[in-house]
Amino acid sequence: MGSTRKGMLNVLIAAVLWGSSGVCAQYIMEQSRMSSQFLTMIRLLFAGLILVTFSFMHGDKIFSILKNRKDALSLLIFSVVGALTVQLTFLLTIEKSNAATATVLQFLSPTIIVAWFALARRTRPGILVLTAILTSLIGTFLLVTHGNPTSLSISSAALFWGIASAFAAAFYTTWPSRLIAQYGTLPVVGWSMSFGGLILLPFYAKEGTHFAVSGSLILAFFYLVVIGTSLTFSLYLKGAQLIGGPKASILSCAEPLSSALLSLLLLGISFTLPDWLGTLLILSSVILISLDSRRRARAA
């Protein structure tokens, strides 16, 4: 298999697994009555530990970033505002609605990123980016109102946390670029997850005594942490390195689609026509932004 096909396959598998992880998280919270805060803590702690361990075995100098005061502070900010917030707001959105809706709303983050950079740099976006912003707004409108501006099809809390999740994902994507360039992806992301989980530990650790642990829940935990987080992250990184960011972004659109289909098949959650139209419009905005990035790269 050629490197391009292998990269595309890795990203596609990662996207499907990421979509399934949201469904898995919803299953865990529904079956155990576990709070989104406790599940976030467990997910971050174990996934972070796995990634840091894997990074160490890979030969990375995992403690270098902690020895530089400025970079350690930047890592702490990323841990709180990035890793912790993006996971917590995502699970809160699932708690208030469902995995499919949470995944689609979080996919607004690319539009937020390009809009922010256009404002910060005072540059006029190209036609592809402007179209992407417009389609994402229309898609969000359809998803949350079903075309009726006088009412919401999801709760106001779900909408709030979903939009917050998109902003957190935008920060998560852009903030650590300098740290990753200097120290590598696995140490930065692994430590950020670990620190994010540790921050929640004093407040939510006691919740572990409030629910019974069954075999199915343990299996779901394993899938969420090992398959849906650690393995998925590694597959996506490897695939993105082989095919480039723009192509990876387009293929990652399989994530919300897999989440919606698995929610339908496994959890009995159905999407109406406005839901599907809104989802497709938001996904098309990601594709347009990726195409614009590819065009700019060729022109440079």
UniProtKB/Swiss-Prot annotation:
GO terms for cellular component: plasma membrane. This is Uncharacterized inner membrane transporter YicL. Belongs to the EamA transporter family. Residues 1-7, 67-71, 121-124, 173-184, 238-263 are periplasmic. The chain crosses the membrane at residues 8-28, 46-66, 72-92, 100-120, 125-145, 152-172, 185-205, 217-237, 264-284. The keyword Nucleotide-binding does not apply. Pfam families: EamA (PF00892). Keywords: Cell inner membrane, Cell membrane, Membrane, Repeat, Transmembrane, Transmembrane helix, Transport. It is found in: Cell inner membrane. The gene is yicL. Residues 29-45, 93-99, 146-151, 206-216, 285-300 are cytoplasmic. Coiled coil: none annotated. It is a multi-pass membrane protein. Residues 16-145, 167-291 form the EamA domain.
